[in-house]
Regions:
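A short glycine-rich beta-alpha junction/loop motif
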Residues: 51, 65-72, 100-124
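Short, Lys/Arg- and Gly-enriched loop/turn segments at beta-strand edges
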Residues: 56-61
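Active-site/binding-pocket entry motifs
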Residues: 17-18, 54-55, 94
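Sequence-specific dsDNA recognition surfaces
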Residues: 1, 10, 14-44, 62, ...
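A generic structural signal for residues embedded in beta-strands
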Residues: 49-50, 135
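Short peripheral tails and domain-boundary helices/loops at the edges of structured domains
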Residues: 68-86, 167
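Amphipathic alpha-helical coiled-coil/heptad-repeat segments
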Residues: 119-170
């Protein structure tokens, strides 16, 4: 048996990545000891990117997990991880266009290996860039929540006003 709901080691699936914004905090499946032994283990805190189906989507793992060949791991890099995450996010639309179609979209690892990116030499600058972009992500998330709440309020107002439950004095 490959799966074990009581295991603390997750099995990363494309659907887990698709619903994750930046940090993956859980997976829908967990692996048994046998599953772990026959998979590639990725400890928490690693940068992972999907290369099949939903290609080019990066995440940072907040849990221990195992991956299949539909993912690549970026570890041992001499770059601040959050900075590299944002570089990959910037490349995501381009890689989506360059994915090879078959039964499902795939991204050639050679394309990843040969992609050149500009990385500031200063880790302080890398951190500053990543912090600015992370702060902007937080602002966007807050605005999206506010927009969602405003839409719900409008929907309620439409229900009240357009059905005659609430009358306006004019």
């Amino acid at each position: 048996i490959w799966f074990d709901r009581t295991s603390s080691v997750g099995w990363l699936r494309i659907s887990d990545v698709s619903k994750t914004v930046k940090y993956l905090t859980e997976t829908t499946q967990s692996l048994s000891e046998l599953g772990i032994a026959n998979s590639r283990f990725v400890p928490q805190g690693n940068l992972v990117m999907s290369i099949c189906a939903t290609v080019g989507k990066p995440i940072i793992t907040s849990v221990n997990l195992c991956i299949h060949d539909g993912f690549v791991v970026f570890n041992g890099l001499s770059v601040i991880q959050d900075h590299m995450y944002y570089i990959l996010k910037k490349l995501e639309p381009e890689w989506s266009k360059q994915g090879q179609t078959g039964s499902q979209m795939n991204l050639n690892t050679e394309l990843i290996n040969t992609t050149l990116v500009l990385i500031p030499q200063s880790q302080a600058e890398q951190t500053a860039i990543a912090t600015i972009l992370s702060d902007m992500d937080t602002d966007i998330s807050s605005l999206q929540q506010q927009l969602s709440k405003t839409r719900q309020i409008k929907q309620g107002m439409m229900q009240e006003l357009l059905t005659g439950k609430t009358r306006l004095k004019v």
